[in-house]
Regions:
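Actuator/coupling domain of P-type ATPases
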Residues: 60-82, 122-125, 129-229, 233, ...
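Conserved catalytic phosphorylation-site environment of P-type ATPases
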Residues: 278, 374, 384-460, 615, ...
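Flexible metal-binding regulatory segments at protein termini and peripheral loops
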Residues: 1-120, 124, 146, 221, ...
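Membrane-embedded alpha-helical bundles of multi-pass transporters
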Residues: 114-117, 149, 168, 402, ...
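Bilayer-spanning, highly hydrophobic alpha-helical transmembrane segments
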Residues: 99-109, 336-364, 376-394, 682-711
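Signature of the cytosolic headpiece of P-type E1-E2 ATPases
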Residues: 105, 468, 477-589, 604
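Conserved cytosolic catalytic loops of P-type ATPases
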Residues: 33-55, 59, 191, 220-314, ...
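Conserved ATP-binding TGD loop and adjacent catalytic N/P-domain core of P-type ATPases
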Residues: 23, 501-503, 543-683
């Protein structure tokens, strides 16, 4: 398939209850012609599918999923709302079924355990069992049948089979007790096992759904930032419309205290806006005509008119939500092993149950038929693919959600796994270690300098987008300088800029450009230049031909949090490397200020990638932290790429991890989050595997020959319910842990 024709979509799936369900949905979607890849996440109840829309449509995918008893929500505009409504409806049904199950299961259990010798008790138990089997347990049997028709199986298969065996065996013994009496045996009934199993499984599902709902609180908070309506200005009148109906170019009125509905630019008025939910910065930002504003942020005290530039799924907030959803729906590398286990889990359990039954019959004969049946039923009931299926995705969901709440955006599960292995962190200086707001702090003029040169320098730097160029432009603007007319402009990557005016060539840039033109620093300036470098200043050299005219000293303040962040990273065993295009003395000064282990100076953008390669060649696992703009090659080369953004400058598509604020203290938090989330995944998987490895043999009766202990199917169902709930609760515990 041509990947250019492919579309990647995320659709909510309803009706899934266990890992086998998720695996079956994944399998059926992958079988469809035109589907390149499909991945189902049980915890988020979502399908991520890559397909060719010319070959297969979302409706066809929906129909394929419905054939095996599930449903796909393909209405993208209302998918979130539909999913919430479906979840609420399912939870309500589950609650009703659970209440009905216990209302009838409890008297059945009492009759079965304490009043077995009362005449006609079997008939009373049968009547009381029917609402549990036919109403509360109906979905188990319906889903199991649909799975069977598709030659697949899941947890519903195990529950349906175990309760059917217990109920049908009891039904036979109620109607035909003579069959056993004629053979000298007692006709036992197990209505209480069938009903209580269903009741316990439903309780487990109810608790699981409640707990799973809490794992998605982060995404719900983000979605809560999206306003439902906007006030559009048309022909001088204001009209409230739904966000979905808002178009690019519409004029929108925003009043004090309101959430901004879409991304756009202010065309009238000024205000202060609280951007903390996006940028993490607590202080409101002043906005005036021409400034950009973001959807979901809150207007403080001024009214303004804005033009909508990005609406719907194209806003920064929508991108953040989509990124978090996709990350929560991604699979950790270890999940591939779990998927292979869960794919064969139910068939293996069925085989173990049959084997258990046969061993009991062979060992004990017909006298042990009841023991054989109870043990087989217990094996079917206690086996829990849910715990295995939920172990990884619930931990990821909580971890990635907690990251989003802390303004740490993690692209996928692989990024979390990789971050845990990082031992070396490379920090780009400008905008990462420093504030990224350089200001001119000094001018050194050489002998050839004339006042008219300022206009030429101004004109040259106006055409450059480099942060240092912007600082020079700002300084000259404050002096009231006017840009001169220049004839040509050339940008030299990692070096600077070259312009011509008449028959003269002027240049401005780093010491490399100084050398390229064969210019030298006079003895008069040399000492002062060294002093500037030693104090951590960045230097821009300006000259004509082979003559140096001026040296501009530019200061970019080190962030208050940089030293503390580096300290925390070093305490966790990380090796810190400072990377900069500045000269040796400047780099040495900044590295000393933050206490980096090592610094690399004079690095061109292309050199930065080689630095990462060299560190990796030393056997290091490297994380590169930059602004995601001028160090994209190095970010791509690193084992983990981390971009720092702020407000409208968030470069979410660039890196595996995006820190949404300029606070470098988020970096050690991100590493802690990775470590804790991956550790949680391993804990969940360990206990899920251990539960099944111990529970299934005990249910089969392995303890009976030694201690006379035989597990009751009712206890087995309670244990199964607790196992999946405990996995979800363990994942939720991450919410209460400090980063």
């Amino acid at each position: 398939m041509n990947m250019n024709d492919m579309t990647k979509k995320l659709y909510p799936v309803t009706g899934m209850h266990c890992a086998a369900c998720a695996g079956n949905v994944e399998k059926i979607v992958r079988k469809q012609e035109g589907v390149e890849n499909a991945s189902v996440n049980l915890a988020t109840a979502t399908l991520t599918v890559t397909y060719n829309p010319d070959i297969v449509s979302p409706q066809q995918l929906k129909e394929a999923v419905m054939k095996i008893g599930f449903d796909l929500i393909i209405d993208e505009d209302n998918s979130v709302q539909e999913q919430e409504e479906a979840e609420q409806s399912y939870y309500g049904q589950l609650k009703r079924k659970t209440i009905v199950a216990w209302i009838f299961a409890l008297p059945v259990a009492v009759l079965g355990m304490f009043l077995m010798n009362v005449p006609g008790v079997n008939w009373w138990m049968l009547l009381l069992s029917l609402p549990v089997i036919l109403y509360s347990g109906r979905s188990f049997y319906m889903n199991a049948w649909k799975q069977t028709l598709q030659r697949t199986s899941n947890m519903d298969t195990l529950v349906a089979l175990s309760t059917s065996i217990a109920f049908l065996f009891s039904l036979f013994n109620t109607f035909y007790p003579e069959f056993w009496y004629s053979r000298g045996l007692e006709p036992h009934v197990y209505y209480e096992a069938a009903t209580v199993i269903i009741a316990f499984v439903l309780v487990g599902k109810l608790m699981e759904e409640k707990a799973k709902g809490k794992t998605s609180t982060a995404i719900r908070k983000l979605m809560g930032l999206q306003p439902r309506t906007a006030r559009v200005v048309k022909d001088g009148r204001e009209e409230d419309i739904l966000i979905a109906d808002l178009q690019v170019g519409d004029k929108v009125s925003v009043r004090p205290g309101e959430q901004i509905p879409v991304d756009g630019v202010i065309v009238g008025g000024n205000t202060f806006i609280d951007e903390s939910m996006i940028s993490g910065e607590p202080i409101p930002v002043e906005k005036k005509q021409g400034d950009k504003v973001l959807a979901g942020t809150i207007n403080q005290n001024g009214a303004f008119i804005m033009t909508a530039q990005k609406v719907g799924k194209n806003t920064v907030l929508a991108q953040i939500i989509r990124m978090v959803q996709e990350a929560q729906g991604s699979k950790a590398p270890v999940q591939r092993i779990v998927d292979k286990v869960t794919a064969v889990f139910v068939p293996v359990v069925l085989a173990v149950a049959v084997f258990t039954f046969l061993v009991w019959i062979v060992a004990g004969g017909a006298d042990d038929f009841s023991y054989a049946m109870l043990s087989a039923v217990s094996v079917l009931v206690i086996a829990c693919p849910c715990a295995l299926g939920l172990a990884t995705p619930t931990a990821l969901m909580v971890g990635i959600g907690k990251g989003a709440e802390s303004h740490i955006l993690i692209k996928d599960a692989v990024a979390l796994e990789q971050m845990r292995k990082v031992d070396t962190v490379v920090l780009d200086k400008t905008g990462t270690v420093t504030e990224g707001r350089p200001v001119v702090t000094g001018w050194l003029h050489d002998a050839g300098w004339q006042n008219e040169h300022k206009g030429i320098l101004y004109a040259a730097e106006l055409k450059s987008e480099h942060p240092l160029a912007l600082a020079i432009v700002e300084a000259l603007k404050k002096e009231g300088e006017k840009p001169a007319i220049i004839d040509s402009f050339e940008s030299r990557t990692g070096r600077g800029i070259v312009v011509t005016r008449g028959n003269k060539t002027f240049w401005a840039g780093s010491h490399r450009l100084l050398k390229d033109f064969g210019a030298g620093i006079s003895d008069l300036l040399k000492g002062m230049v060294e002093d500037y470098e030693k104090s951590g200043k960045s230097l821009v050299y300006f000259g004509e031909g082979n003559t140096l005219l001026a040296v501009i000293a530019i200061s970019d303040k080190i962030k208050d949090t940089s030293r503390q962040a580096v300290k925390q990273l070093k305490e966790s065993g990380k090796y810190i490397v400072l990377l900069t295009g500045d000269g040796h003395l400047t780099a040495q000064n900044v590295a000393g200020e933050i206490d980096a282990n090592r610094f690399i100076s004079d690095a061109l953008p292309a050199d930065k990638e080689n630095v990462i390669k060299e560190l990796q060649a030393e056997g290091r696992v490297v994380a590169m932290v930059g602004d995601g703009i001028n160090d994209s090659q190095a970010l791509a080369r690193a084992n983990v790429s981390i971009a720092m953004g702020k407000g409208t400058d968030i470069a979410m598509d660039v890196a595996m991890v995006t820190l949404m604020t300029s606070d470098l203290l988020l970096l050690p938090k991100a590493f802690k989050l990775s470590y804790k989330t991956v550790r949680l995944i391993h804990q969940n998987l360990f206990w899920a595997f251990i539960y099944n490895l111990i529970g299934i043999p005990v249910a089969a009766g392995i303890l009976f020959p030694l201690y006379g202990i035989l597990l009751n199917p009712m206890i087995a169902s309670a244990a199964m319910a607790c196992s999946s709930v405990s996995v979800v609760l363990n994942s939720l515990s991450l919410n209460w842990r400090k980063l």
